[in-house]
Each structure stands twice: as C-alpha cells, then as structure tokens.
Amino acid sequence: MKVRAVIKLVEEDGWFLDRTRGSHKQYKHHFKRGLVTISGNLDYEVPRGTLNSILKQSGHKEILER
C-alpha cells in the first residue's frame, strides 16, 4: 500500500493533519486519543510492519485481519 492510500484511509476516518516535520506527518482526531505518524514520500510503498503500526494507531484493526 502506498503512503498516499494510507493517508486517504486515515483522513476518511476523521484524522486531520496536525503537524509536519520533514517527511513525517502527524495526524490527530477530535475524539480518538493519540497521534498517527505517517512518514515517507507519497509514492513510497509502506512496509508491512509499518502499515500494521499505523493501522493500530488509527484504530483500523479490522483491516489487519484481512
């Protein structure tokens, strides 16, 4: 999955961009706790372990089971 697709998934769930430093983007949610950090160029492929971590942070556990 590309970084662009991960960002789209997170934003559709209500997360919004809070801050950026270099290639790292941190997203916040109005109701959910914590931050979701996504790094890399938009066209980069996200490694499987990193993708699992991002999905756990954002609360998308159902996607992990697929």
Tell what function each PLM region has.
Residues 14-19, 62:
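Short secondary-structure junctions
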Residues 34-35, 41-66:
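C-terminal structural segments of small proteins and small subunits
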Residues 27-31:
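Active-site beta-strand termini and strand-to-loop segments that position acidic
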Residues 2-14:
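Amphipathic alpha-helical segments
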Residues 26, 37:
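Conserved beta-strand positions that form and line the central face of beta-propeller blades
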